[in-house]
Amino acid sequence: VLIIAVLFLTACQLTTAETSSRGKQKHRALRSTDKNSRMTKRCTPAGGACDATTECCILFCNLATKKCQVPTFP
């Protein structure tokens, strides 16, 4: 009886560990996809056309001229 109880508890632990590791794997895959999407975003260089949805490279979008430009400080 003791051997059967030990085998049952071991099987329960293995089943629980397997399902929880699958859940973690899904999250790892999502994090990897997020990281890749952040790394592949492109930005518009100085003088390039832009609008409210465009990302300028370390610059800002002048909506009046619709061009990316470096901020000027007085």
Swiss-Prot record:
This is Conotoxin AbVIK. The presence of a 'disulfide through disulfide knot' structurally defines this protein as a knottin. Its main location: secreted. It comes from Conus abbreviatus (Abbreviated cone). The keyword Nucleotide-binding does not apply. Residues 1-17 form the signal peptide. It is found in: Secreted. One of its GO terms (molecular function) is ion channel inhibitor activity. The keyword Signal applies. One of its GO terms (cellular component) is extracellular region. Transmembrane segments: none annotated. It holds the Pfam family Conotoxin. Expressed by the venom duct. Keywords: Cleavage on pair of basic residues, Disulfide bond, Knottin, Secreted, Signal, Toxin. Belongs to the conotoxin O1 superfamily. Residues 18-40 form a propeptide. Residues 19-41 are annotated as: Disordered. Disulfide bonds join C43-C57, C50-C61, C56-C68.
